[in-house]
């Protein structure tokens, strides 16, 4: 693996006139993505100085003074990167498909936080002979998928506990990410149609990619080396 710990400047990039941070800002979300991104960052010489899971802070310094980390909701990561509030970020492919992140560069499949985006419904229950109701937080993905199947559906936006919807008649099916399927089975549901495979992707702001490439390049190279060494 290429050693990149000393590839970046050791003095923090700060515009002293207005305290503007001129280094790299990385957007991450708590949970599985954060946990599985940490080894990649450590290999690139970037380590958080505090545990985000044990803190209420939202901005974290790292062992590299020219890299800081923002902790966001997963669904907000593409927005922060797209608008330049973060230079780069890690987001699930499911979030990118739902967001329609057309104005960021999707540079790497990090092959972490892997799962599947699927439809699911009550086990062995036939679907009604009418326009289906689909409960999901992936409204755009659901509409696009069923349209590709030639089906018109009513999509009901939910923010969590999708598994409940078919059990109480709110939706005929759900669209959600499925890992082991244990949560579905525990609630009497079964996975049905496979929509797409999901993994976390490294996304970069288009302007930052050009203007800060010298800072980004060693981190990108390290990520690539880490991915190649485990594939």
Swiss-Prot record:
One GO location term (cellular component): cytoplasm
Keywords: Amino-acid biosynthesis, ATP-binding, Cytoplasm, Glycosyltransferase, Histidine biosynthesis, Nucleotide-binding, Transferase
Keyword Isomerase applies: no
Annotated InterPro entries: ATP_PRibTrfase_cat, ATP_PRibTrfase_CS, ATP_PRibTrfase_HisG, ATP_PRibTrfase_HisG_short
SUPFAM superfamilies registered for this protein in UniProt: Periplasmic binding protein-like II (SSF53850)
This protein's pathway: Amino-acid biosynthesis; L-histidine biosynthesis; L-histidine from 5-phospho-alpha-D-ribose 1-diphosphate: step 1/9
MF term (GO), any: ATP phosphoribosyltransferase activity
E.C. no: 2.4.2.17
Gene3D superfamilies per the UniProt record, alphabetical: Periplasmic binding protein-like II
N-terminal signal peptide: none
Pfam family, one: HisG
Subcellular locations according to the entry: Cytoplasm
Top-level taxonomic group: Bacteria
Catalytic activity: 1-(5-phospho-beta-D-ribosyl)-ATP + diphosphate = 5-phospho-alpha-D-ribose 1-diphosphate + ATP
Swiss-Prot/TrEMBL GO biological process terms: L-histidine biosynthetic process
EC class (word): transferase
Notes concerning its domains: Lacks the C-terminal regulatory region which is replaced by HisZ.
Function as written in the Swiss-Prot or TrEMBL entry: Catalyzes the condensation of ATP and 5-phosphoribose 1-diphosphate to form N'-(5'-phosphoribosyl)-ATP (PR-ATP). Has a crucial role in the pathway because the rate of histidine biosynthesis seems to be controlled primarily by regulation of HisG enzymatic activity.
Family (UniProt): Belongs to the ATP phosphoribosyltransferase family. Short subfamily.
Assembly: Heteromultimer composed of HisG and HisZ subunits.
Protein name as catalogued: ATP phosphoribosyltransferase
Lineage: Bacteria, Pseudomonadati, Pseudomonadota, Gammaproteobacteria, Moraxellales
Gene assigned in the entry: hisG
